[in-house]
């Protein structure tokens, strides 16, 4: 576009383009070169000197011509943009708002240029009907070009306007450039410099040099930088000052006016440049820019013009937009300046228009700042909230009655809006007429102007006049309202002030909810809200509907996310809550008068209940009640007085309140019932949006905060609510379709008119926008207009259709919520509900069949054909160029629109069907719950029977539905079937159900496959299918294939179902071993192989894999566990075991894992040569010799490693030299030793610990004998690792659930002494150590599992003592004496769990009765062992007493068992007998020994004194130490 020298490089190949005036103007701009214009100022100062030579005259003449050329280019470019000949590309923001702002704000319209170019003006008049949209890059280049050629060595603030016409022309250069930037940005909303940060820096620097205060501007001469010229100019200025003082006064005033206007226009341009471009400002430019703007925005500085301060504040806000943390170190400075200005302005605010506008600008900039500066309100928000509450109600008479305010509101809203538009049009017409009739120019009141007028240089008279009425003109520039509209103007400014105040509060509540929570009492009512001004005051008394809506939005923001804060509410009755006040608010405008009152009056108004004390939790309760009452009061008002937009926002507030309010703590069902009664009439509203929002609120009432049937039934009966909901579902369209169609037609006409005004040619480059002929441009505009009309009509139709469908969806969700929580209410209408839901599903199926929806393969073929056709069309269209491209765009848009409508309708229909099936899911859950609760009501049985009859009739058509959500819902419905429901079905229906679920496992969509896998895992638990070996075999085979699915959700559900299957197989083998043997061994082999392959998959999968592997290790027999080739990937297949069946399943399985098709085809095809041994046509692998067999296995293993999916890359199942048991244990150990501490991996660890305990339940697993450990050492290499891993986890794992499972695995009921082997002592000491450290909890969240862990450790201790041998008791003396208290407490705690027998404990050598000891034990006890001390506390009661506790309610499966406990007592008794005659024990050991004796004998009472003395000795010994 432009070369390095600044010359234009536009292609001139087209002669027509070279004669185009638009092209000529742009070419002239890009050909401009920089000249030294400061010589004109020096020549102007030395105009009395006659010694100028000819060379200087030539230079001055060239500079003058260059100055005129610059002004001509700027004026013509301004005219082009004003007449919309040139336009910038609009942003995706609504352009109507930007255009209205553009028309409302006025810039000074200068006088005509003294030396205009007549040719350019004529050409412009001939081509004003052509609109050319310039790209953003070209606009930026134009602006940068002007910025580079304009002089930077001139101090514009010191130029004398009356000095000469040249001075006046020089000062117009930056003024015109600023006006051009503002004009461009108003249409485009902002000029984006994301890809042009250097250009932005150049423009900002230019205007920053102009707007800097004189204190900051460096001393720069107004003439060329030479000492002679500067001295001469100073002498001449002194002479002029001495000659006439009056002329100096006039020149100084004009100088001040020029300085002010130039700075204001430059600030406007800078503000436009900074809008949304803050992140593009370089770090070097940030500090000087912010310092300059902060200084100019100082409200206390009287030397700065008021409008300058206001626009500087606006610029600060625009600078903060989208900056994030880039300006974090400057946010505090900006906030301090804005807050200080806000405090000073509001301290003496009155009806002055400028003060109101200035306050509004501060509020807007502060909002933009708070959105970016996180945490800035944590320390600097105390005084701000009080000021904002004051401004919320500024200009509102809050003492007005409710009805009068509502009536006045809408009369003003509609009539004043029309009146304002008419007055604006009249004002613009008057301005245009005055401009055309005025001969001397003057100040124009419209920046847009007329197409026949062109902006030029502003004269001194116009500048002086524009500043004479500064306050009025400043208002007119920004709003376009004349003085005749003063009443409307004042209302508009006050409404805007309140609007921005509430918007700022909304932003503060959204970005700092914790800080704002402390100020709830300022803005929310704790008493009936007419007494105190709150947010409800704005919602009810404000005359502007926009403020009502934004106040409701503010209330919604306050409530949203407050659920955690509202937990602290207190519903206790507090006294003195309602008080009678001696004084009431009767002033006409108490909020306005508050600004002029002192702080004492403010406190009196804000704290009306200061005489009583209530806690904050009680205030929260009162606030919630008043919020409900206020919303209900607004909803109950006559809807004719309330606009739909406000009603919709109120309903959104209600929805947010229902979600966040803790109704269970309020314990006030009357609030919910009254709220439901207030919302119910809106479900029949004409507006679909209000109707939809009200249905959402009711759904949340039924679902999130369900009412009881007693509370809900009267409200539903009074409003006929259920019948209305069912009518919505039964009717295709609502009753208000005609009204909606009329509204749509009106909207279409309005949109068509808007489209007619925007006939634009989109172009990305300047050449493409200039090459097209005018006729081609008009044709293209017509085609675009037609396409937009068709597209808009389709959008309106689809939108209307969507609204009706969304209403039906919400109705279905309401029925589902009623079914979930209050199914008894819906039983009265259950027949009608069934008929409506089935009819919706049938209608959907018929629509799918009639529309010709095909499978995914056919769709892919059609897409490929369409792509080929499009490619052919593109090749043909390249030859025909633009016309064919336009036709193609039309066809594609029409085709896309029709496809979008079809897709939208299909998706909506599928969603309706999906929600119908979700409602069926809730019905099946309710029926299942009734079976669990043993509900014998006949209505439930009839409802259940009718449902399944209807559902199975429509089931065949649902299974072939093209939408996966519907097929997945079928599986979810079947997952809610219980055992009784399944048994009540006929055999045909049972077979149909199972076949459908198993068939959907192989669906094309992963959503359906995952749901089907989950359903299989639930069906396995049904009693009728427990004994079905075929079902179990088929389920195992299908789930095994799903374990290799690509989608992770499918693998998670399949693995969970496989774990359930393995759980069932464990119980099946123990109870029905014959039925267990009917399951094919090959299927179990595939299950094990898939589990081992998945043991290193995603942690969500591994948590179920380790559970299934533990169960498998529990029920597998010895032949499977100690086999090397049982689960090898390519196992040998015996010809006697159904070759064809097995080969088919294996090929399917390997196909599901992926990568084995070539090998299986090579084996079974019989045609190709294969290094793996050839094929015989039957699919079996028959190696010829042993060497070929080894080679074959090596090749198979290599191919398998290359073909496994990524999740199996770390699998250990490829080891051939390991037995199955070693591979299972190795997998479990690696999962138990997982170092990650995330929740998913922790779940893997505790399931792996539980699975390791299942190994000790299998009696076929060989453990080493004490006599011959070396013989079986090869079969249990994993045993040391198992014990060391479990001991480590039991002692040091942070997660207590993992420690609990590790402890239970170390002491299973089948854990014999032989299974512990040499690790018995390590386990015993580890359990005692863990019990001693049970109170050391590192994570407080684990404290809830502390008691369960202690109980499990005590059970493990009793079991370990019971398995102790007699010959090794002496080796544990230190443990018994060191941990005596722990052992005694463990036995005492479990005396409630253990049933106490009537007979004494049987022993092999001794026997004792309940009243005396045996003959062998009597001398032992009578010599040295003290008996028990009987106390009244349960904790010290002996384990075995003469009176048995009541154990009828205790479960028999609790541990420790009687056998374990008896053996443990025998070991303790034997330990005490071994230390009976030992005289070397100290007193502490004797005390511990006596405590142990309490566990089995307490009958001797002669040793009470001796035992008490031992206790005294023990206590004195502790005190002495």
Curated annotation (Swiss-Prot):
Renumbered to this chain, the Polar residues biased-composition regions fall at 455-464, 763-774
| Comp. bias intervals (Low complexity) | 94-108, 219-254, 431-454, 465-482, 735-762, 775-788, 1398-1453
The record's section on Pfam families has: DUF4042
Matching entries from InterPro entries are given as: ARM-like (IPR011989), ARM-type_fold (IPR016024), DUF4042 (IPR025283), HEAT6 (IPR052107)
- Name by which UniProt lists this protein: Putative uncharacterized protein DDB_G0272456
Q: Does the keyword Coiled coil apply?
A: yes
The record's Gene3D superfamilies line, in alphabetical order, gives: Leucine-rich Repeat Variant
Give the start-end ranges of region Disordered: 1-20, 85-124, 218-254, 431-482, 735-797, 1398-1455
State if Magnesium is listed as a keyword.
no
Coiled-coil residue windows = 853-903
Q: Give the record's keywords alphabetically.
A: Coiled coil
């Amino acid at each position: 576009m432009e070369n390095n020298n600044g010359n234009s490089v536009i292609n001139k190949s087209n002669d027509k383009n070279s004669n185009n005036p638009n092209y000529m103007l742009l070419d002239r701009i890009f050909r401009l070169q920089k000249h030294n214009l400061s010589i004109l100022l020096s020549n102007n100062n030395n105009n009395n000197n006659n010694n100028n030579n000819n060379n200087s005259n030539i230079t001055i003449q060239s500079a003058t011509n260059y100055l005129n050329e610059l002004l001509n280019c700027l004026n013509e470019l301004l005219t082009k943009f004003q007449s919309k000949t040139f336009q910038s590309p609009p942003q995706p923001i609504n352009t109507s708002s930007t255009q209205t702002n553009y028309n409302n704000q006025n810039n000074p319209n200068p006088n005509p240029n003294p030396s205009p170019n007549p040719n350019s003006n004529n050409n412009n008049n001939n081509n004003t009907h052509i609109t050319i949209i310039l790209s953003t890059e070209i606009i930026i280049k134009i602006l940068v070009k002007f910025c580079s050629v304009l002089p930077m060595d001139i101090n514009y603030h010191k130029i004398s306007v009356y000095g000469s016409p040249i001075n006046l022309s020089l000062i117009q250069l930056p003024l015109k450039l600023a006006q051009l930037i503002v004009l461009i940005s108003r249409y485009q909303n902002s000029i984006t410099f994301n890809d042009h940060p250097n250009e932005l820096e150049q423009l900002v620097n230019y205007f920053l040099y102009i707007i800097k205060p004189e204190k900051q501007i460096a001393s720069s001469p107004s003439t060329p930088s030479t000492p002679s010229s500067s001295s001469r100019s100073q002498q001449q200025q002194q002479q002029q000052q001495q000659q006439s003082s009056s002329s100096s006064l006039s020149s100084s005033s004009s100088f001040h006016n020029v300085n002010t206007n130039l700075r204001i226009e430059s600030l406007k341009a800078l503000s436009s440049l900074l809008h949304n471009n803050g992140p593009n400002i370089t770090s070097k430019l940030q500090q000087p820019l912010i310092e300059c703007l902060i200084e100019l925005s100082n409200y206390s500085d009287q030397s700065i013009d008021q409008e300058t301060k206001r626009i500087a504040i606006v610029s600060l806000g625009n600078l903060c937009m989208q900056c994030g943390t880039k300006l974090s170190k400057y946010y505090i400075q900006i906030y301090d300046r804005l807050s200080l200005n806000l405090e000073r302005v509001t301290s003496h605010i009155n009806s002055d228009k400028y003060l109101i506008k200035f306050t509004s600008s501060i509020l807007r900039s502060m909002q933009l700042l708070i959105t970016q500066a996180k945490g800035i309100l944590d320390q600097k928000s105390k005084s701000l909230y009080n000021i904002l509450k004051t401004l919320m109600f500024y200009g509102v008479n809050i003492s007005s009655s409710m009805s009068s305010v509502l009536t006045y509101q809408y009369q003003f809203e509609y009539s004043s809006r029309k009146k304002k538009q008419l007055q604006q049009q009249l004002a613009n017409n008057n301005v245009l007429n005055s401009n055309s009739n005025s001969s001397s120019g003057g100040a124009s009141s419209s920046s847009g102007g007329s197409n026949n007028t062109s902006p030029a240089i502003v004269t001194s008279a116009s500048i002086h006049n524009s500043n004479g009425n500064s306050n009025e003109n400043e208002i007119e520039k920004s709003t376009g309202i004349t003085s005749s509209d003063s009443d409307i103007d004042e209302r508009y400014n006050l409404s805007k002030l309140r609007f921005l105040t509430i918007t700022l509060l909304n932003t503060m509540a959204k970005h700092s909810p914790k800080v704002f929570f402390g100020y709830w009492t300022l803005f929310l009512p704790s008493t009936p809200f007419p007494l105190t001004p709150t947010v409800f005051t704005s919602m009810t008394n404000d005359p502007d509907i926009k403020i009502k809506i934004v106040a409701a939005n503010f209330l919604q923001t306050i409530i949203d996310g407050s659920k955690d804060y509202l937990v602290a509410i207190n519903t206790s009755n507090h006294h003195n809550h309602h008080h009678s006040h001696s004084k009431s608010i009767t002033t006409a405008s108490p909020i306005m008068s508050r600004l002029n009152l002192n702080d004492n009056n403010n406190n009196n108004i804000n704290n009306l209940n200061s005489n009583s004390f209530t806690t904050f939790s009680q205030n929260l309760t009162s606030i919630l009640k008043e919020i409900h009452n206020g919303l209900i009061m607004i909803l109950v008002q006559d809807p004719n007085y309330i606009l739909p937009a406000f009603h919709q926002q109120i309903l959104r507030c209600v929805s947010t309140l229902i979600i966040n309010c803790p109704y269970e703590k309020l314990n006030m069902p009357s609030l919910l019932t009254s709220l439901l009664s207030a919302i119910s009439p809106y479900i029949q509203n004409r507006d679909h949006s209000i109707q939809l929002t009200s249905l959402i609120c009711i759904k949340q009432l039924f679902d999130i905060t369900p009412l009881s049937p007693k509370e809900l039934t009267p409200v539903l009966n009074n409003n006929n609510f259920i019948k209305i909901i069912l009518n919505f579902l039964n009717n295709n369209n609502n009753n208000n379709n005609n009204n909606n169609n009329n509204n749509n037609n009106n909207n279409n006409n309005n949109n068509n008119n808007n489209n007619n005004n925007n006939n634009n040619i989109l172009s990305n480059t300047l050449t493409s926008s200039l090459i097209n002929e005018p006729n081609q441009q008009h044709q293209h505009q017509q085609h675009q207009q037609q396409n937009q009309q068709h597209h808009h009509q389709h959008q309106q139709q689809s939108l209307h259709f969507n609204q009706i469908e969304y209403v039906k969806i919400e109705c279905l969700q309401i029925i589902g919520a009623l079914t979930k929580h209050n199914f008894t209410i819906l039983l009265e209408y259950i027949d009608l509900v069934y008929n409506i839901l089935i009819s919706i599903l049938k209608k959907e199926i018929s629509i799918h069949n009639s529309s010709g929806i095909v499978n995914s393969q056919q769709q892919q073929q059609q897409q490929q054909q369409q792509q080929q056709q499009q490619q052919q069309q593109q090749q043909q269209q390249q030859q025909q160029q633009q016309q064919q491209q336009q036709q193609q765009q039309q066809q594609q848009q029409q085709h896309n629109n029709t496809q979008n409508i079809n897709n939208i309708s299909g998706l909506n229909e599928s969603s309706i069907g999906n929600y119908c099936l979700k409602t069926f899911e809730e019905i099946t859950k309710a029926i299942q719950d009734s079976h669990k609760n043993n509900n014998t009501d006949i209505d439930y049985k009839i409802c259940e029977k009718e449902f399944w009859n209807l559902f199975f009739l429509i089931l065949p058509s649902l299974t072939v539905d093209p939408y996966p959500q519907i097929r997945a819902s079928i599986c979810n419905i079947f997952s809610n079937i219980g055992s009784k429901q399944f048994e009540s079905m006929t055999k045909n229906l049972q077979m149909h159900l199972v076949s459908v679920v198993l068939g959907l496992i192989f669906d094309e969509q992963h959503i359906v496959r995952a749901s089907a896998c989950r359903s299989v895992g639930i069906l396995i638990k049904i009693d009728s299918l427990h004994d079905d070996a075929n079902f179990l075999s088929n389920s195992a085979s299908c789930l095994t294939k799903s374990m290799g699915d690509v989608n992770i959700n499918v693998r998670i559900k399949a693995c969970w179902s496989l774990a359930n299957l393995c759980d069932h197989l464990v119980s099946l083998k123990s109870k029905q071993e014959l039925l267990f043997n009917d399951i094919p061994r090959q299927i179990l082999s595939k299950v094990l192989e898939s589990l081992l392959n998945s043991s290193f998959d995603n942690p969500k999968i591994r948590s179920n894999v380790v559970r299934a592997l533990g169960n498998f290790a529990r029920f597998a027999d010895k032949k499977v566990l100690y086999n090397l080739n049982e689960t090898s990937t390519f196992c040998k297949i015996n010809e006697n075991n159904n070759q064809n069946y097995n080969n088919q399943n294996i090929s399917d399985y390997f196909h599901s894992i992926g990568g084995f098709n070539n090998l299986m085809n090579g084996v079974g095809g019989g045609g190709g040569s294969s290094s793996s041994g050839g094929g015989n046509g039957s699919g079996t692998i028959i190696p010829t010799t042993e060497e070929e067999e080894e080679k074959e296995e090596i090749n198979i293993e290599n191919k398998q490693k290359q073909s496994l999916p990524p999740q199996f890359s770390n699998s250990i199942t490829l080891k051939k030299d390991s037995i199955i048991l070693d591979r299972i244990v190795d997998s479990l150990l690696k999962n138990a030793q997982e170092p990650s501490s995330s929740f998913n991996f922790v779940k893997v660890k505790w399931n792996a610990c539980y699975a390791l305990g299942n190994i000790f339940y299998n009696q076929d697993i060989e453990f080493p004998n004490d006599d011959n450990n070396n013989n079986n050492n090869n079969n249990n290499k994993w045993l040391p690792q198992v014990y060391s891993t479990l001991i480590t986890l039991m002692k040091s794992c942070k997660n207590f659930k993992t420690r609990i499972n590790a402890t239970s695995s170390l002491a299973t009921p089948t854990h014999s002494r032989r299974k512990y082997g040499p690790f018995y002592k390590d386990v015993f000491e580890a359990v005692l150590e863990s019990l001693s450290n049970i109170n050391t909890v590192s994570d407080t969240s684990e404290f809830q599992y502390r008691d369960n862990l202690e109980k499990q450790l005590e059970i493990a201790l009793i079991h370990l003592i019971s398995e102790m041998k007699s010959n090794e008791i002496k080796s544990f003396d230190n443990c018994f004496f060191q941990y005596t208290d722990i052992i005694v407490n463990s036995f005492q705690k479990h005396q409630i769990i253990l049933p106490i027998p009537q007979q004494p404990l049987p022993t092999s050598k001794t026997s004792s009765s309940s009243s005396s000891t045996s003959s062998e034990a009597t001398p032992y006890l009578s010599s040295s062992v003290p008996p028990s001390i009987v106390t009244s506390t349960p904790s010290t009661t002996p384990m075995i007493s003469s009176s048995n506790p009541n154990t009828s309610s205790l479960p028999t499966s609790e541990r420790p068992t009687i056998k374990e406990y008896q053996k443990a007592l025998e070991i303790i008794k034997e330990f005490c007998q071994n230390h009976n005659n030992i005289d070397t024990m100290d007193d502490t050991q004797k005390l511990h020994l006596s405590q142990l004796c309490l566990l089995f004998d307490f009958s001797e009472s002669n040793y009470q004194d001796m035992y008490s003395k031992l206790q005294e000795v023990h206590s004195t010994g502790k005190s002495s130490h």
